[in-house]
């Protein structure tokens, strides 16, 4: 009976959660945490009806994954269970990802609060997170300040509530984001046999902002309508891109790498949970909004421009809506933040650790207004006297705060909703004696006007409080739909109104305009939020809605649990009392601007590029955006009349345009890359990484039997990504070895030194093998292309060779500047490492200190190096010759092409400064499209093909002179490079599993089921690369502990 009662209690409390948006949270890392809906089974007998709760987990985690290169889907949900004593799974009521996307806040119906940390593993599984709290508050009401004694509550471990001491401090290791550990618990009600205490439940929650600048891209702006200035998009309008850099705003933890959050319980207790100056543990301080007994039914938390926390709460006992401001004095953390900018390991002495404090002030109090609505759903103005029988009184349904955003002109808005459809918007404004309210009170005078006038007659001048703030009514918004919840968007630049029928309005918080749903039935009544969508192409493209996309319609029977992706490209949803715990995933749908000509494709690509740039600047996962791009490509193919080849060409045209616009949107110019800037691309530049991963996925999606050469595009992206990671690994390892040998003489080497250095060398063995085999494959292609060329010149006929100019990989890799520089850099790094290891081997042998670990690792390295069928130094010299040749020839040929075009247009070749063709277009053609002589969509592509063909013949002739005569043809052509899985002989399903990071075969099965005991795999959610979990501290693979080479997240499997 007790169990059945508890299940009924759980179901009732889940239904009573005021906002279904509290039950799901989508992080910018791409992980979706959600509280599963109640899955019930009803059993009926002649005498009773029994309902059974079938939930086995109370918290689930999922993410979007690339299943086969062409399809995206949600992964099977993984249980992240929150347990109380005796392994009891309480019903959860709140889940929210933090601002840094690694901390997950969770609360249950008993009021217990938990924080989980994603991407870490607990080294001591038996460690239980403790709760250490400090309470310190100053309450201020009006001009009276009441100080309370500081009270410290704790378990004796730590000082001033801070667990920076080694006592009871857990140790973590970094791992994939789908692995989580609980790092904090605030247990209010551990006894599950006690009835739920309604006063302990959390009714409002918010994460604090991060104390660091944020870059966000501006809206794409239409620049011109001049055909002579257009790019390869063949459009008469081109768009320009820019960025905004916002300074930290709102309320932030003073240390940029730390987080804090605030919560309000139903009994009026306000709590600040915050991290200390080091480590990940949380602490808390709290205060009560009032000394009286209160039951807060509806509340919201936000931040204003003065770095204050604003709380608006409705007390059901007094029927008052109260507004409070809360200031945080961060204590010693402010000074620590300054010191850590100079010394990141700075620790504040314990005697100087003054804990944070809260200062509370009541700003305003009012009663809910009487709000009326016509029975048929039409709104009624508050000034109109209601007619009984036609109007009904709407009750207070929700309170929401839209925080001020980084724009200094923005302000905090308090939204009070009645009847789930009528929104009254208020703002907090400082007092001004010149402004009077409709009730006859001045903003600066809280007493009635009559008493104020009496004071003037008595010559008593009351000047008021210059710092006083009043709640000012701004406007009323009428909605035809029933509002489920209102949530803040990224950086509070927008807010989302989610309706009970599943539709969503996106509201710009600065202009107060709805940027989507211009034709939706839920549109605002009146003209408060009108948006002109008749301008096409639009002057500004700031989101996908500007190009005719809209959130999909959802058919459902029960209450929806819905979340919108951070890129606003798709939604996920489920139903309470649904048939499954799995979420449903839907991308945006196109409802307008269905054109498929080259202009329309370009405008669409601008919208996609703007969103992709937003994801890159804000470190947001964009997998859902790729899903939308692929669905749009499929829509275009289905909408066009014609054969399959025509449809696929149109899809490829959009694909290429999206990639090119993404380069432009983040201001990444392939033609400006130099040898000097290559180090930045290797170490800390995510732009190239993200652009290549986009090219990899879209290129893989475009592969079909109608375009057999389409493998070239993803292969080029994959090779350059691997060249980047391999070069980074080699240089990192080379630096580590150099530091080790510079500290000690070879005669002082120990066994531990040998083990450490041996591990460094072994970590790059696979990448050495991959690089050498890649060079071998490139030489194989070059030899075949020379054969094809000579056969055509000598015999005048075509060859039966599968390899041609169009499907070659080696030619675009050498002709393109970026890939050529990466090749040269990787070969140079190999050469330097080879020389150091040769010297090290010699010195250790002479000193009789060549221990077994070093001996084994060096033998494996030299075995790979010595068995190569090519001479690496010779090929490096060839690449340098090609580099010098291309740096000279490419500008000359581009100049000739432009002169030729200008001569054709103007009648002479020297009078125009018009440059329709550029080095950028040439480099983009090679890296993004490869060499496709059949690609002739526009004049720019035809010029590229002509130049590429001429330059290809040059580098093939140079290869014939420099290398081919000194190459052992039989050894080279029969050398096995199939495991690289690139080029014309690529296997769709390899017969083994390769660690993509370390370039080692880890399983003789493509299903990865025959791993060694104790080994675990991680998989990339985007490119599907696999790698072994576990990175030795100090090795280069630590750089990729959480993210793949393509920049997306790993997930442990």
Swiss-Prot record:
Family: Belongs to the Mediator complex subunit 16 family.
Keywords: Activator, Nucleus, Transcription, Transcription regulation
A GO term from the CC aspect: mediator complex
Subcellular location field: Nucleus
Bias-annotated ranges (Basic and acidic residues): 142-151
Name of the protein this chain belongs to: Mediator of RNA polymerase II transcription subunit 16
Pfam families: Med16_C (PF20719), Med16_N (PF11635)
Family matches, as InterPro entries: Mediator_Med16 (IPR048338), Mediator_Med16_C (IPR048339), Mediator_Med16_N (IPR021665)
Residue segments, region Disordered: 139-170
Gene (UniProt): SIN4
One BP term from GO: positive regulation of DNA-templated transcription
Superkingdom of source: Eukaryota
Quaternary structure and interacting proteins, as annotated: Component of the Mediator complex.
Task of the protein: Component of the Mediator complex, a coactivator involved in the regulated transcription of nearly all RNA polymerase II-dependent genes. Mediator functions as a bridge to convey information from gene-specific regulatory proteins to the basal RNA polymerase II transcription machinery. Mediator is recruited to promoters by direct interactions with regulatory proteins and serves as a scaffold for the assembly of a functional preinitiation complex with RNA polymerase II and the general transcription factors.
Primary subcellular site in the record, as a coarse category: nucleus
